[in-house]
Amino acid sequence: MLSNPSQVVLRNIELFESKNVLLINHECDLLATALLEDAAKVTTLALDFNHFQRIKSHENARLQCHFGHQLPSTQTFDAVVLFYPKSKSLAPYLLNLAGRHLIPGGELVIVGEKKGGIRSITKQLPDYFDGGIKLDNARHCMLYSSSLLSEAPEIKLSDWVKDYVLSTPQGELTICNLVGVFSEKRLDEGTELLLEHLPTLKGRVLDFGCGAGVITAALLKANPDLELECVDINAMALASCELTLAANGMQAKVYASDGLTQTQGMFDAIISNPPFHDGLDSTTEIATRFVQESEAQLKSGGIFQIVANRHLPYSDTIAKFFKTVNVAAENNKYKIYANRKA
């Protein structure tokens, strides 16, 4: 099943006849394989690891799939399809990236949901693209086209990052935020409560859903000898976490993982401010899987400590897999769940 934006792209498949096409920030579907009916070759760059996993197994001589914030080569394409990001601040970066990978005069096709920022895309196009035209309007989405007029500037991550000093219970930290990565530029209430009640940790520790690396850096500030691993599904978050580590002179293993699937071995502790906040059934299912996988990959006596919104049903899930529920701290918004594996 194709997402609405992907369906609109497929409605206009004639744009890609016999062309070498790049998809940037694509959806969690198989649009790339469908485009091969007309396109000569398709390359995909997913910024979401789950979206990459969805298409990766379909790779062949005409389909190349990548995950990350940039392609591993300077290859150029006849056409680039850019899926407008949910975070509007990420759009200028992706437009720059698209420009770097287009041949002179190459076509940029931009698709997005109307409720996003796609309506004003012609005002957002940098001057190395022409003004852009609307090609389609369907499935609650809009599709625009623009041509590359001149060479797009080289991408340097340092141009797309904002750093700031954050005061935490463990001390001051420098946090690096790339565009598109959530930041309040202060310690959010949930993370603050978690850091205020961190246990003494040692050994191999996992920071699940690391984001820009706030918890990561705080853990290493408290104990630089931790064997710390940091996972997320967002390419910009992972790159931000690496920049945060470098800015604080710290080291950890940072990589993409769907839940805990890509992690290996057992951990002495799993610490997290899990990115599941809306309480929807689908989100609750993911959260349940996270608790189950965490219990399975903790050593005996290992620590599982997370912060969560009070209204989320973590208690029953934790009781199911850890046999007991321990709330180490709470306020009117959040709870700290702290359990040890039997």
UniProtKB/Swiss-Prot annotation:
Subunit structure: Monomer.
GO cellular component, one term: cytoplasm
Compartments it resides in: Cytoplasm
Coiled coil: none
EC number, UniProt record: 2.1.1.172
Primary role: Specifically methylates the guanine in position 1207 of 16S rRNA in the 30S particle.
SUPFAM superfamilies on file: S-adenosyl-L-methionine-dependent methyltransferases
One annotated GO molecular function: 16S rRNA (guanine(1207)-N(2))-methyltransferase activity
UniProt entry keywords in alphabetical sequence: Cytoplasm, Methyltransferase, rRNA processing, S-adenosyl-L-methionine, Transferase
CDD domains: AdoMet_MTases (cd02440)
Listed name of the protein: Ribosomal RNA small subunit methyltransferase C
InterPro entries given in the database record: DNA_methylase_N6_adenine_CS, Mtase_sm_N, rRNA_ssu_MeTfrase_C, RsmC/RlmG, SAM-dependent_MTases_sf, Small_mtfrase_dom
Record PANTHER family: RIBOSOMAL RNA SMALL SUBUNIT METHYLTRANSFERASE C
Organism: Shewanella loihica (strain ATCC BAA-1088 / PV-4)
Catalytic activity: guanosine(1207) in 16S rRNA + S-adenosyl-L-methionine = N(2)-methylguanosine(1207) in 16S rRNA + S-adenosyl-L-homocysteine + H(+)
Pfam families linked to this entry: MTS, MTS_N
Family classification: Belongs to the methyltransferase superfamily. RsmC family.
Gene3D superfamilies xref list: Vaccinia Virus protein VP39
